[in-house]
């Protein structure tokens, strides 16, 4: 799927959401934010909803379990490195991994690499197998 975070590497914006006044999500707070929850994001015409299963499995909700054409499926793995301001979430879709800092801008989130926004305005929905609004 073209919308997965690993394929979203072109810079979406400048430095605005990868520094203050946004707050970097670090250490255990990063694991708490993602584990057992769904990240909802969009860029251009692509939209995705990735479920961060406890234990590290990463699922794309797509159109849900009941959809015969585009059901939810595992797309890779995720993990968190808790290291203060060097804390990152790493995604592996089977073709190599990508690591991102996550910045909280008041309830929407930016996924950043080297201070550059790759995905912005992402939201987190509580739970898995719930889809995004």
Indicate where each model-derived feature is located.
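Bacterial N-terminal signal peptides
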Residues: 2-10
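Lipid interaction determinants
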Residues: 13-75, 81-133
């Amino acid at each position: 799927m073209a919308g997965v975070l690993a394929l979203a590497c072109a810079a979406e914006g400048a430095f605005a959401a990868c520094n203050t006044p946004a707050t970097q999500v670090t250490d255990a707070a990063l694991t708490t934010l993602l584990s057992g929850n769904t990240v909802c994001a969009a860029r251009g015409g692509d939209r995705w909803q990735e479920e961060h299963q406890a234990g590290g499995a990463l699922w794309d909700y797509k159109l849900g379990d009941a959809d015969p054409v585009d059901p939810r499926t595992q797309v890779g793995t995720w993990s968190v490195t808790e290291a203060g301001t060097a804390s990152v979430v790493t995604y592996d879709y089977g073709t190599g991994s990508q690591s991102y800092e996550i910045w909280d801008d008041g309830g929407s989130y930016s996924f950043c690499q080297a201070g550059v926004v790759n995905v912005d305005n992402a939201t987190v929905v509580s739970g898995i197998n719930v889809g995004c609004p």
